Amino acid sequence: MEFVVSLFAFVVSCFILLKVAKNSKNPKRNTNLELPPGPKQLPIIGNLHQLGGGLAHHVLRNLGKQYGPLMHLKIGELSTIVVSSTEIAKEVFKTHDIHFSNRPSHILVFKIVSYDYKDIVLSQYGKYWRELRKVCNLELLSPNRVQSFRSIREDAVLNMMKSISSNDGKVVNLSEMILSLIYGITARAAFGVWSKKHEEFIRLESEIQRLATTFVLADMFPSIKFLGALSGLRYKVEKVHKKVDDILEGILKEHRRQNNNMTEENGKKDLVDVLLNIQKNGDMETPFTDQHIKAIIFDMFSAGTLTSTIAVDWAMAEMMKNPSVLKRAQDEVRNVYNGIGNVDESKLDELKYLQAVIKETLRIHPGTPIVHRETREECEINGYRIPAKARVMVNAWAISRDPNYWPEPDIFKPERFLGSEVDFKGTHFEYIPFGAGRRICPGISYAIANVQLPLAQLLYHFEWKLPGGMKPEELDMTEILGTAAQRKENLLLIPNSHSCSSLKQV
C-alpha cells in the first residue's frame, strides 16, 4: 500500500498542471443528465484510494450497497461505471448491448501480449471482431470442433488418474495436477502435440499472467504516455512476450511445413491448422496476418485454461467442505458408469447432479468476477448519463450472490439448479459467469468440456480425505484475485482408490 501511496504522491506533484490544462481543453458535454451516483473523489486519483481495501469485486459490492446498483467512479483519469444488479446488467448486455460492445483499451500488459488487440477477447467491436466471432462459432470453438478433441481429453484425464492412483494413500497437490492437465489438453488441441517447447510456452504464459496482476499506474492515466516505461513493467512484459513470440513463430513454421505434406485424410486438424487454412484461403475480408493467429492462440491459453482450472479446483474444494454434496455426486457418477470401470464422455449428459455442482461452483466462484466493457458512445440508463469511452465493470460475483434472486446466496447448494432453467449462456442476467451479450465468452463449450470429465473421473475413481486430520469446516477457502479469482492455497488431498475403479488394470 505504501508503494501505491508514493506513486500517487508522485502523480500529484508531477502532473497536476498537466491534468488541469488537459481538462480545460475538453469540450463541454451534455449536462442535461447527471452521472450515476458515487463516492466523493480526490483530485487526480479520483476514487482509486477506495479500491485498495480488499478484492475488487468485494469492495465494489460494498460501495454498491451505499451508492446503488449503477455507480460512477473516477479511477485515475478514467470514468468508470459499476453495475451490481441483475436489472442493470440486463440494460447493459441486452437493451444497450451495442453501446457496451467494446473492451477496455490502453491496458499496458494486454496491449503487448495481444499484438495490439488483434485477439478475440480484447479486439474492439467492428468488422474484424465480427468476422473473428464467426470463425470462433463455426470453426475454432464450434460444438463439432470441441467434440473432435474428445480423445485428447479422455487420454489426458486418464493419465492424470493413473498418476493419482500411483500415489494412493499419499497427499497429492490436486491444484497443480489440474493446472497441468488443462494446459496439456489445450496444448494438444492447439498444437497437435505436447513437447518440452510447449512446456516453456506455458511457463512464459504463466509469467505473463503474474505480470498482468501488477498495479500499473499507466493504465489509470493513459494520456500520460511515458508512465508505462517509467515502472519498468513494459520492458519486463516485452522481454517475456518476445520469447513467447519466438515459440509461436516456430510453431507456425513447423505447421506450414507439415501441412505441405498432409492431405485431409492423413491427419487431424488442430487449432493452428484451422487458423492457417483460414489465412491461406483468404476467408477473412479484413487482414489476417501471423500476428493475428499468434494473438488468438495466446488467447486460448490465457483465457481458455484458467476458467476450467479454477472451476475444477473450486468444485473439489467445495465438495470437500460439504461431504453430503461429495457423496451424492460420487454416488451419481458410480451409478451411471456402474460396471464399466472407467469414465468416458459418452454418459456425461446423464450426470444431472454433477452439472448442478458445476453451475453452483460458477455461481459462487465465477472465474471472472468482474466483466469488463467500454462504452462506444454516450447513452442513458435509468435516467443517468453513461459517458462515451467509459470503463464498465459488471460485478458478476455480486449479482450471483444477490439474495433477491438467490436464497441463502453464500451457501453452496447445487440442489438450487436441479429442475431450474437458469444456465450460463447469457440469457439469465442473474447468473453471468461467462458474461452476456454479443461479447459473451465464445469458449463456453470448450471450458465446460474441460471441467466435466476431470470432475467425473475424480469422483468415480477415488475416495478423498483432507490431510492431517483436517475437518471440512477447517479447509481454507480464502480467495485471491489475479487475472481470475482463485483459491489462495493449493488443494492438498489424500486419494484412496475405490473398488469400482479399473485403474490398476489399465
Curated annotation (Swiss-Prot):
Q: Where does this chain mainly localize? A: endoplasmic reticulum
The residue stretches assigned to a coiled coil in this entry are none
| Top enzyme category | oxidoreductase
Enzyme Commission no = 1.14.14.-
One GO molecular function term of this record is: heme binding
Q: Where does heme bind?
A: 441
What reaction is this protein's catalytic activity? (-)-tabersonine + reduced [NADPH--hemoprotein reductase] + O2 = lochnericine + oxidized [NADPH--hemoprotein reductase] + H2O + H(+)
Tissue spec. comment: Mainly expressed in roots.
Its GO CC terms are:
endoplasmic reticulum membrane
State one Pfam family annotation.
p450
Q: Can you tell me which family this protein belongs to?
A: Belongs to the cytochrome P450 family.
This protein is called what? Answer: Tabersonine 6,7-epoxidase isoform 1
User: What organism does this protein naturally occur in?
Assistant: Catharanthus roseus
